[in-house]
């Protein structure tokens, strides 16, 4: 685990799933269940490789690989239903959450930049009673281009009214890491609540 000096940053943009919350096992389980209902076995790595991507785009990727997904809309809706049935069990990653609280205490602006739906973000923040710590939410519902496109992070900077050099992204998934690079923002790469490396813009 590396040590990071967060003092230069005035804006913090946190990915949600796999970064701030340990939700990926819950997402994978939901995806696998829907796949099973469509008579095929889904490799967990397929989902982990697409961390940060929208559910819609993940289903399109499944379709491209020849999987029977039926209605894309219904497939996504069923996955969301299964995930949300267990959302109150999803824990926070403590080290990443500490970065958030310490940044907030010194007056930095806090945004969540995620490929998940807004309702999931709102529920997670309420479940853990941390809604008051987050200034802005940029969800899958708020953008037209999803990670690895930089729109999520560009919108976060716009809302925070800060330039890239004053911001940092905290991310675990390759699409989000690529999005941060495209937005010219420093990116702290995390894995299972460990700080792996700091990618400079």
Question: Model regions: which residues?
Answer:
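Phosphate- and divalent-cation-binding pockets in alpha/beta enzyme and binding domains
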Residues: 30, 58, 95, 120-123, ...
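Conserved SAM-binding loop
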Residues: 20, 92, 110, 145, ...
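Asp-based, Mg2+/Mn2+-dependent phosphohydrolase catalytic module
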Residues: 1-10, 101-104, 117-201
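Active-site neighborhood of HAD-like aspartate-dependent phosphohydrolases
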Residues: 1-48, 182-183, 197
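Short beta->alpha linker loops
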Residues: 26, 50-54, 91-95, 116, ...
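A metal-dependent, Asp-based hydrolase signature
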Residues: 52-82, 102
